[in-house]
């Protein structure tokens, strides 16, 4: 049986206390107010890991060893829909992320929304909080080592599955595939992911 892993830091008393406090707080919040953000990545070497073949045969799929810059995906999700997705070549920086929040996320927020994200350094500039609060929303960071509290994680898995199925081998095709892939996400997916992450559906 394949082993699963989890961060050893979850065993720390301080981390457990933060997670418990977050869970107590979130039970009082209407899940329709929650907006989760996160990043993921894709590259030109992505493809399916399994294939149907006649018994005794082996499929050898050419994949580039030098695939250049990773394609960063940054998106946001609500309990009833995928909110927005953008792509950019290279690593996510604080400036890039703040620009995305200002131009892509903020116009889609509503007064009273609660924006949640992890503690990545690029997420910490004060400008991000100012942008979010300017539209009447609030910003809150997830507890450390708590990706399981972010319902966008399985969305990335679904998007990457689509990318692996297409197996794009040029930059423009990879980017176009990633930008189209989120259209497979339906409201029922979002609701199931929120429920799986422990959020009560109103």
Language model regions located:
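Short functional hotspots at interaction and active-site rims
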Residues: 1-202
């Amino acid at each position: 049986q394949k082993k699963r892993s989890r961060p050893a830091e979850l065993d720390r008393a301080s981390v457990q206390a933060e997670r418990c406090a977050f869970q107590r707080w979130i039970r009082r919040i209407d899940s329709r107010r929650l907006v989760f953000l996160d990043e993921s990545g894709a590259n030109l070497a992505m493809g399916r890991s399994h294939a149907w073949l006649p018994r005794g045969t082996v499929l050898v799929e050419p994949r580039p060893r030098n695939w250049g810059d990773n394609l960063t995906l940054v998106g946001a999700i609500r309990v009833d829909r995928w909110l927005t997705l953008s792509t950019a070549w290279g690593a996510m920086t604080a400036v890039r992320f703040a620009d995305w929040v200002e131009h892509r996320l903020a116009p889609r927020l509503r007064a009273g929304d609660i924006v949640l994200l992890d503690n990545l350094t690029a997420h910490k500039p004060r400008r991000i909080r100012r942008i979010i609060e300017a539209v009447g929303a609030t910003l809150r960071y997830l507890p450390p080592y708590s990706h399981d509290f972010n319902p966008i994680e399985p969305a990335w898995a679904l998007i990457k599955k689509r990318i692996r199925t297409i197996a794009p081998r040029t930059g423009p095709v990879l980017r176009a595939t990633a930008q189209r892939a989120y259209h497979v996400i339906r409201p029922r997916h979002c609701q199931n992911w929120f429920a799986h992450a422990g959020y009560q559906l109103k």
